[in-house]
Amino acid sequence: MNKIAVIGKVFVDIKGTSFAPLHKDAKNVGDITFSNGGTGRNVAQNLAVLGNEVRFISTVTNDQIGVGVLDELKSYGANVDHVEMLEDHGMGMWLAVMDNEGDLQTSISKQPDAKLLEEAILRQSIYALDGVDAVAIDLDLSVTVLERLIHLCRKMELPLFGVCGHLSVIERNRHLLQGFTGFICSREEAEILSDLSIVTVEDAIHVANELAKKGAPFTVVTMSELGAVYVDRRTATSGHVGTKKVKVVDSTGAGDSFFSAVLSELTQEKSAEEALKLGMKVAAEVIASTENGLVPEMLDALQ
């Protein structure tokens, strides 16, 4: 069983899904649901359900909701001993508005206390990284945290993989990607980071290669219905993996689930192509459900 440390934020997601096409100047009748989310938390859940030994490093608020977040993660098998409980602002909230096709149209994000989260991660990472096989980190954290984890992983010779919860920090500090083993992003994120346009699969491979030259040697770009591409400059290989069309119920968490499956396979020394294939399967299961991530009931469909 692989041991993977996951570092990132916890959010409580509030999703409103319209029953009909959205109209910004009218009342939209629909459904509203509450669920636990956040890129770091989602990745921790996905990796645990896939059978990895997960150590989650984060903060939650010391209230009923925060306790519920931890209980849910523990039920999936994740270790939450390195999650610190704060009296206030230990986690964020995400308000999402989905259209009747299940696609995200707009959102508002309330962030957890950045300084307290940073302090907790710096404290806990000293102990939590001992004995792990790999580290996954949400890139929507402070530069101080990212630099510290890059330093620790280099010192401990641990592979470090980054996933974009939000692009703002890494967009302003693109040089930090040089400290990562692997980086996975969407087509839109890749276009912003590379200042290049992606229309075809060939475009995506070119952009992934340009990003890999300046950043993580293993770079993946996801392209929704066109699948995903990868470039691995360590082995001078690249490729494309397609995906099957699925009915979208809720696209939230699809990127996190794809990232998790790819990382899970890579830490088991599977090939990049095998990793991306599982990533596509897992993402498809999540997209076709109302879940933010993989749950045990979905595992049979991955066989």
Curated annotation (Swiss-Prot):
Q: Which UniProt keywords apply?
A: ATP-binding, Kinase, Magnesium, Nucleotide-binding, Purine salvage, Transferase
Q: How is its activity regulated?
A: Kinase activity is stimulated by pyrimidine nucleotides, especially CMP and CTP, and inhibited by AMP, ADP and GMP. Activity is stimulated by potassium or ammonium ions.
Query: To which pathway does this protein belong?
Result: Purine metabolism; IMP biosynthesis via salvage pathway; IMP from inosine: step 1/1; Purine metabolism; GMP biosynthesis via salvage pathway
Listed cofactors:
Mg(2+)
* pH dependence of activity: Optimum pH is around 8.3.
The conditions that induce or repress this protein are given as: Specifically transcribed in the early exponential growth phase.
- Entry's cofactor comment: Manganese or cobalt, but not calcium, nickel or zinc can replace Mg(2+) but results in reduced reaction rates.
Pfam families found in the cross-reference section: PfkB (PF00294)
Q: Does the keyword Transferase apply?
A: yes
Question: What GO molecular function annotation could you give as one example from this UniProt entry?
Answer: kinase activity
Reactions catalysed according to its record: guanosine + ATP = GMP + ADP + H(+); inosine + ATP = IMP + ADP + H(+)
Q: Which domain of life is it from?
A: Bacteria
Stated role: Catalyzes the phosphorylation of guanosine and inosine to GMP and IMP, respectively. Can also use deoxyguanosine. Shows a strong preference for guanosine. dATP, GTP and dGTP can serve as phosphate donors.
What is its quaternary makeup? Homodimer.
The entry sums up its family as follows: Belongs to the carbohydrate kinase PfkB family.
Query: Which named protein is this?
Result: Guanosine-inosine kinase
